[in-house]
Regions:
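Glycine-/small-residue-enriched transmembrane alpha-helix faces in small-molecule transporters
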Residues: 1-40, 158-184, 306
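Helix-helix packing/entry segments at the starts of transmembrane helices
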Residues: 16, 39-41, 94, 108-115, ...
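Membrane-interface helix termini and inter-helical loops of multi-pass transporters
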Residues: 24-35, 101-102, 151-161, 213-226, ...
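C-terminal transmembrane-helix exit sites in multi-pass transporters
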Residues: 49-57, 97, 116-141, 267-287
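Hydrophobic transmembrane alpha-helices of multi-pass small-molecule transport proteins
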Residues: 50, 132-153, 206, 263, ...
Length: 306
């Protein structure tokens, strides 16, 4: 049992490492492709990768094949739930996150995204009528102050575009909706199946937007050698491996405990931003990250002890 618990926590940490890196990979790709094209190709790569995994697993296990045949009907029965989940994430979430990142810096973007666990209990209070404690509220205030601390300079002026802030917080709200939909899906399907189905539906959502945005803002598809590696990394590691690992951790730990891992995203992003793209991390950003993480831990610890 202890070994299984270690595996669950390991999956959560690895997922956050890949998502921390995804902010850097996206920044690299955005130098050549517009966000919509990046997301569309990212989902195509993910669907191909996950499809191959499912095919190999199907070939190597008859029991798995029989189980999947039985689950085909169940997937059709819950197609509306899959469609809603995919609308939240990857479709809307990727749009807001990508355009937010385009108008911000990786570390600041990841710190805002890390506030998702703060808004989850607030949404649960209104939608699921779950109790909202004073520790939820206190943690929310502290973390929010941390985000503001990172967004303002000494003259109290914004260090990033207001447009980027709006996009990123929109991504946070969408992710909260996705967490609520995912809660039911993890009780019915395996993590790999959930990730595969939601990415296929998400890719379908992006098809018309891809053709519209390519006409408005053409991408530099010709220079593929300059961005193929980070693009493949987004599709394989961020959209496939990370989502599958996190869905597994989510199914074992529940929403509150699983969302705690989001605290690690800005930490990993800050570390890898310095190493890979040479982003400067000053004391103000470090203090902001610490406030965000401190507030998140404060709000979650009391929930878990209840």
């Amino acid at each position: 049992m202890k070994d299984k618990g270690v595996i669950v926590h390991f999956c959560g940490v690895v997922a956050m490492i890949f998502w921390g890196l995804s902010f850097i990979w996206s920044t690299q790709v955005f130098s050549y492709l517009n966000p919509t094209t990046t997301i569309f190709f990212r989902l195509i790569i993910s669907c191909i990768f996950l499809g191959l995994l499912l095919f190999i697993k199907d070939r190597t296990s008859r029991k798995f094949a029989e189980a999947e045949k039985q689950k085909e009907v169940r997937i059709k029965d819950n197609l509306k739930l899959f469609a809603i989940a995919a609308l939240f994430e990857p479709f809307l979430y990727f749009i807001f996150e990508s355009y937010g990142l385009l108008n911000s810096a990786p570390v600041v973007s990841s710190a805002i995204i890390a506030t998702i666990p703060l808004f989850t209990p607030i949404a649960a209070f209104f939608i699921l009528r779950e109790r909202l404690t004073r520790w939820n509220i206190l943690g929310f205030i502290i973390s929010f102050l941390g985000v503001i601390f990172m967004l303002l300079n000494k003259s109290l002026e914004l260090t990033v575009s207001p447009k980027g802030i709006i996009f990123l917080f929109s991504a946070v709200f969408v992710a909260v909706g996705y967490s609520i939909a995912l809660r039911k899906l993890t009780m019915l399907y395996k993590p790999l199946t959930i990730t595969f189905i939601q990415n296929i539906i998400g890719m379908i959502y992006f098809i018309p937007m891809f053709f519209i945005m390519e006409r408005i803002s053409p991408s530099n598809i010709a220079g593929i050698s300059n961005y193929i590696l980070p693009l493949l990394s987004l599709g394989v590691f961020a959209s496939s491996v990370a989502y599958t690992l996190w869905a597994y951790a989510f199914s074992k730990l529940g929403a509150s405990k699983a969302n705690i891992y989001s605290n690690l995203i800005p930490v990993f992003t800050a570390i890898f931003s310095c190493i890979i793209i040479g982003e400067t991390i000053n004391i103000q950003k470090i203090l902001g990250i610490l406030l965000v993480i401190g507030g998140l831990i404060l709000s979650q610890l009391k929930i878990n002890n209840k």
